[in-house]
Amino acid sequence: DLELTDLIVGETRRIVKLLEQVEQFGNLSPPERRAVNIHDVLDRARRSALLGHSAHMKIIEDYDPSLPMAWGDPDQLLQVVLNLIKNAGEAADTAQGGTIRLRTYYEHSFRLRRADGSGQVLPLQIEVIDDGPGLPRDIMGDIFDPFVSGRENGTGLGLALVSKIISDHDGWIGVDSVPGRTVFRMSLPRPPKGVPPPA
């Protein structure tokens, strides 16, 4: 019967997608870091999202024009921003759309302290802010763990991948969420002294 066939096809696609995400998560290569204009990365992600999964959303750019270069792998950072925009778009009421704000700013005093006592200054701040319903309170503390999702059909690997990429960049990511406003904030380092700007 057609209904059963549709169900089987749908479940098969879901399983294939899940396996692809597990493979991507396990096969992530170390970042090839260089000086990166994070605004270029955000713009690429914005344009891609508006042509695809977040076409129903309004995306606002709120950038600090004096922001210096970040130290990172532009392709991996693009994946991070795409995942965050996709999550924001999926969280919004698709009939009404919603607004995503991409914000950057410089915070010279933000420092990541590691368990071994070492630390690193992470002055470049990137935020992806949406006006969706917010994250469920019961998963807030675990949202970056694999297989934790607030959506019925979510795999829980998108934000785990985001967290792994940011960690591999010696960065930090956090989330603050209330109904009507969710903010994912990434903090990244500047390039080491002597690294030339991108060509």
Residue spans for each PLM region:
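A conserved beta-strand-to-alpha-helix junction within the catalytic ATP-binding
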Residues: 34-46, 103-105
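Short beta-strand/loop element within the Bergerat-fold HATPase_c
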Residues: 97-110
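Conserved catalytic submotifs in the C-terminal HATPase_c
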Residues: 56-68, 107
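Short conserved segment of the HATPase_c
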Residues: 121-123, 135-146
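Detector for a conserved hydrophobic position within an alpha-helical segment of the HATPase_c
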Residues: 166-167
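Short alpha-helical Gxxx[C/S/T] motif in the catalytic ATP-binding
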Residues: 158, 162
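Histidine phosphotransfer helical core of two-component systems
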Residues: 1-13
